[in-house]
Amino acid sequence: MIYTKNTKQMTDQQIIDALISRDEWVTYQFFFKTCRPLFVSVMRYVFSYKVDYDEFVNEFYLHLMENDAIRLRQFQGRSTIYQWMKVVAIRYFIAKRDNMIDMEPKVALTECAERGDSFDEVQKTTARMDVERLFSLMPNKRYVYVIRRLVLEEAEPNKVAEELGTNVDNLYNIKKRAISALTEIALNEVEKYEKRRRK
């Protein structure tokens, strides 16, 4: 099979097929170039300390390739390969982190309990990463600040208004415009995804 010189120009299924067949060039480009920002973000959200990227991604790759790449063969194209890979990576790294905690006797049991159910954490981590990505697409960083403080951090409106040098009434107007802008960006992203799927 002949590939382009950029995995971004390949279809999702072409990438999966190339990974399953252990194509060295595609494997390197995908895990160490194209998906590097994605995996770095996942590791930053999952681990509270710095980890070795190459080491952890190599282990993740071996995990995917176990039993004749059975996990890669589960990709069905219902989402993009990057969205799918993000969820798989989050699950893997949360399990790895929790396993490392289990091996550390000095960690208090309450700390382990506070981490909650892994499935819930996968969903929360995925949602946080999706929101941060949408924030990065918003040109008006004041809107991002207002949504982050009022919605995500649930800060008091009076305090946020003071931080922005405005009043509460104006702050609510800013919040309304900010959520409208965020919704428009999210809908545009969904539309782009649907167009890619139809190709």
Question: Which ranges hold each PLM region?
Answer:
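Conserved RNAP core-binding helix
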Residues: D12, F32-K33, V40, K50-I70
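Short amphipathic alpha-helical boundary/capping segments
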Residues: I15-L19, M43, D130-N140
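A short, charge-rich alpha-helical start-of-domain segment used by transcription regulators
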Residues: D17-V42, V51
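Short, aromatic/basic-enriched loop-to-helix "N-cap" motif that marks the start
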Residues: V51, E55, A69-V87
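Arg/Lys-rich amphipathic alpha helix in sigma70-family domain 2
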Residues: K86-K106
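Internal acidic/polar
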Residues: M100-R128
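Short amphipathic alpha helix immediately N-terminal
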Residues: F135-E163
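DNA-recognition helix of helix-turn-helix
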Residues: P157-Y193
